[in-house]
Amino acid sequence: MSGFDVQPSRFGHVALLGRPNVGKSTLLNALIGADLSIVSPKPQTTRHRILGIATHEHAQIAFLDTPGLHEGGKRAMNRQLNRVARHAPDEADVLLHVIAAPRWTDEDEQVWKLIEQRDIPCLLVINKIDLVKDKSDLLPFVESISKHHAYQGIHYLQATRGKGLKALMNDVVRLLPEGQAVYAEDDLTDRSARFLAAEMIREQL
């Protein structure tokens, strides 16, 4: 139809990857607008692959929250959590590499090595920017990362207060493949109410 700019519908899976305690679960909850994934200062709180669904006018996004990838996973549970995280990109159309400002650690580099093995577009999400008192310090930090890591975009967030979410969501939608929504408009997750209740109890422990 000439004369009309018809925006195509988009659908895809977006995996949140990162080392423990960078704010992946807080980010997932902020993106879908509901407390779905456990938030705790304790490491390795996320033990399962959690799917959160965000539905907008022209796009539906299935976000995958994953356990934090970490080095030295010698315990059986830690090895299992690492396996869950490592397989998350297998079902993703877009990746979000979440890090916590203002540090790039060996574990962040480990996550990047997993990402670069896949031919999947990836955005770098620098969370917790409120911890950086002098924001001018972010520029050399990001420049040092960009020299050796090819991301399709970089976003600065304070997920606890929702800062930077709109720009991130717009960039995610831009990278999604065209497709129709898979879930109902009011669906927030594929997990059962029983599972979510158990997770809420575990968050309080």
Task: Describe the role of every protein-language-model region.
Residues 1-94:
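Conserved G1/Walker A P-loop phosphate-binding module
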Residues 15, 34, 38, 73, ...:
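Conserved short-loop catalytic and cofactor-binding motifs
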Residues 43-45, 67-70, 101-105, 129-132, ...:
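Conserved nucleotide-binding/hydrolysis micro-motifs of P-loop NTPases
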Residues 121-123, 130-189, 193:
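Canonical P-loop GTPase G-domain recognition
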Residues 193-204:
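P-loop NTP-binding site
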